[in-house]
Regions:
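Sequence/structural signature of beta-propeller domains
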Residues: 1-239
């Protein structure tokens, strides 16, 4: 566990974004919000597979070169494969009342695979879509994760966390679920509510689509406290 109480948070790799590649490899991306968090971990399929760590310095340098001209800190929170693209979700953090930089950074999947295997330099970002997620009580929403359903749609989570810094946790005022457009920045969002119909204040930071249906998901809540484990829950989308 990495937190301020233990004094070890600076060593946290912050593997916020995970994706399974077409060859069944699992790739976990550090958020890139600090040099320590510019690492990538891969796990090959098969029994007894070991996790391998590699530097992502050139990857994050390439992403940072395309980041927000307003100076927002790079903070990759989600990754999905959709068609020919590896899509990386940048989470915006900002002051109350200001629009944060939430964006989708698209990299050609075949070029990324070549880089991952050491055959090519890291490919440039080919498409960037800034996404406007709104705010709640003055606190802007920011991406926290994404997943692809069986029918190819990209679902995402966004939380309104009251903090101005990607390295500092803050209270959550609400969460939203949404669908992301394939070739444009359009989104369709809805508030996430609990079993009693009340808006959740949990920090939902993980989502995975269940096999066989595009409206049922598993989600993970990060409690941001070292003495309390993360929670896993079922999310049902009513369309």
């Amino acid at each position: 566990v990495f937190d301020d109480t233990r004094g070890n948070k600076k060593f946290k790799m912050d593997l916020e974004a995970c994706v399974v590649l077409p060859d069944s490899r699992l790739v976990a991306f550090g958020s890139g919000s600090s040099p320590q968090r510019e690492k990538i971990v891969t796990v090959a399929p098969g029994k007894g597979a070991m996790a391998q760590q590699m530097s992502g310095e050139d990857l994050y340098a390439g992403l940072r070169a395309h980041s927000d001209p307003r100076g927002a800190r790079l903070n990759i929170e989600g990754a999905v494969v959709q068609g020919e693209w590896l899509r990386l979700l940048q989470r915006g953090n900002g002051k109350r009342g200001f629009e944060p930089w939430n964006a989708i950074l698209d990299v050609a999947l075949d070029k990324f695979l070549g880089w991952l295997d050491g055959r090519h330099p890291f490919p440039p970002v080919r498409r960037i879509f800034e996404v406007h997620l709104g705010a709640l009580a003055g606190v802007p929403f920011g991406f926290t994760d994404a997943a692809v359903t069986d029918d190819g749609r990209v679902a995402f989570l966004a939380c309104a966390e009251d903090t101005e810094d990607a390295l500092i946790d803050g209270p959550v005022t609400g969460c939203r679920f949404g669908w992301l457009g394939a070739d444009d920045p359009s989104v369709v969002v809805a508030p996430v509510v609990d079993g009693e119909g009340k808006p959740t204040h949990l920090k939902l930071e993980g989502i995975e689509a269940r096999t066989g249906g595009g409206t049922m998901f598993d989600v993970v809540a990060d409690m941001d406290r070292g003495d309390e484990p993360a929670q896993i829950a079922e999310l049902a989308v009513r369309e």
